[in-house]
Amino acid sequence: MSYLRNLVKMMSYYKMNTLHVHLNDNGFRQFFADDWNKTQAAFRLESTTYPGLTAKDGSYSKAEFIDFQKLAEEYGVEIIPEIDVPAHSLAFTHYKP
């Protein structure tokens, strides 16, 4: 999160005003023995509705993300949370096949 906060400050300095934050992604199956079940996938935002969906190896809490959005607003940067589907939705199918 500290990287994103610093990025917003730098963007503001350079008069950039929109940041897409990519919240889900997955690897390519050919790098995981051509097996989708072994392919890395993650959803990086805390979900109380679907608690098993949130990545175990690192994620943003709702409060943390809201604070980040408020900071960005102070610097004139709009945060657009990006949920990339259907292309990078392996985290969803791992959660609920």
Q: How should these model regions be labeled?
A:
Residues 1-97:
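Substrate-binding cleft of carbohydrate-active enzyme catalytic domains
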